[in-house]
Amino acid sequence: KVFGGGMRQAGFLAAAGIYALDHQVERLKEDHARAKALGEMLGKLHQVSEIFPVATNIVIARLEGTTPEEFMKKLSDQNIKSVKFGKDLVRFVTHLDFDDDQLEEFGKRIEKI
């Protein structure tokens, strides 16, 4: 492994990357559009003071009047996953398996927090 013996798995990783470039790049626009919509929904919450500009499939929300831990607990109670991203930030990510129906459901669930 010291001399590259652990690199034999690199071919599997490279194959996944090649597949993604060949088959997924065009549909990334869908993830980005859903992320933008998700950010707009989050921006309506009183706990969210700012949504960073959404240019990809990542949404970052700045919180006010609550901690990321408290906010994430409320999200978790609605089966919504997020990640703490700083002292007052929470991050969300859309992906291939997050579709329009789930986006709509997300909107309904965050109204409950």
Set out the residue ranges of the language-model regions.
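Structural signature of PLP-dependent enzymes
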Residues: Y19-G39
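PLP-dependent enzyme catalytic core of the Aspartate aminotransferase-like
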Residues: T66, D88-I113
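Conserved PLP-binding catalytic core of the aspartate aminotransferase-like
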Residues: V48-L75, T94-L96
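Short amphipathic alpha-helices in soluble, non-transmembrane regions
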Residues: F71-Q78, E105-E111
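Short amphipathic beta-strand starts and helix->beta connectors
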Residues: M41-Q47, K74-I80
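Flexible, glycine/charged-enriched surface loops at secondary-structure junctions
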Residues: G6-G11, L45-V54, F85-G86
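PLP-dependent aminotransferase class I/II
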Residues: K1-A20
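Conserved PLP cofactor-binding pocket of PLP-dependent enzymes
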Residues: P53, N79-T94
